[in-house]
Amino acid sequence: LESIKKNSTFDHQIIPHVNIGEDGTKEFLKLENIEYTYTKYNSGICEGMNKASKKASFDYILYAHDDFYFCPGWDTEFKNEVDKIKHNNFYLSGTMIGSTGKDSLDCGTNIDNFNEKKLLENYKKLNFYDFQGSTWAPHLIHKDIWNKVGGFSEEYYPGTGSDPDLNMKLWKENIRIFKGLGKSLVFHFGSVVTRRNNNNSKIKTESGNRGNKIFLLKWGISIKFFKKFYLKSDLPYVSELSEPKKNINYLFSLVLCKINYLYLRYFYKFK
């Protein structure tokens, strides 16, 4: 919240969703005069985001995690891109800076050891580019489009797999701009919920988890297939997307998806 307030060019309506809220979060938000939504239970990302989005007063909805630090100029990059596009049929995302991996910056793993000074002195030195097929937060969608597709699909509780599912729903609405902005940066501490539940089969990465199974049964293809052949994820951005080329690689991978689909549907009996 602090980073949004001090590092934003524009004024934003901030609407957190509070799960359970026994740690004083509700009281803090009330003191800060920040509007929020609330459930007495852990609603997960999808239900929480859907509830919060209903309170949105502006034309665009930005979904973000609670463990992001927004770097200066993050919203200017979004605004400039929206102005270039000149219509509402898009899905834009920022770029996450991690503490490990390629183009990383070790600025801490939590709020207690966060080195804000190091981040602000070095984030512009990182070599990020605009990329194709983003499925990650922070993402920006026009509110009319968000409402048209029904926001996040809540069957993906607690949330893993819901991002590419949203992308697929947008694809079905003939949206072909899925662009990650290399200069709109947030520092990501990493999911605290995932770390706490790293043995929970419901909370894992996209490949092989419950969310991937739901996606496969819902759409007939895997998340990996969708990101590779449709979204062309992580390639440098060139232009809006078109229908995938149905070459041998595509057809072979599609057959594997259908075999996995049949296994899940009729033998594994996934619920």
State where each predicted segment sits.
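Conserved donor NDP-sugar-binding/catalytic core segment of glycosyltransferases
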Residues: 72-110
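Glycine-rich, basic loop-to-helix element that forms the pyrophosphate-binding segment
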Residues: 39-56
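Short, flexible, basic/aromatic active-site loop/helix in glycosyltransferases
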Residues: 109-132, 136
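Short, acidic, metal-binding catalytic loop of nucleotide-sugar glycosyltransferases
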Residues: 2-11
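Short aromatic/hydrophobic "clamp" motif used to bind/position activated sugar donors
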Residues: 61
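Active-site donor/metal-binding and catalytic loop motifs
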Residues: 97, 157, 179-202
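A short, conserved alpha-helix in the catalytic core of glycosyltransferases
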Residues: 78, 132-150, 155-185
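A conserved acidic beta->alpha catalytic loop
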Residues: 18-27
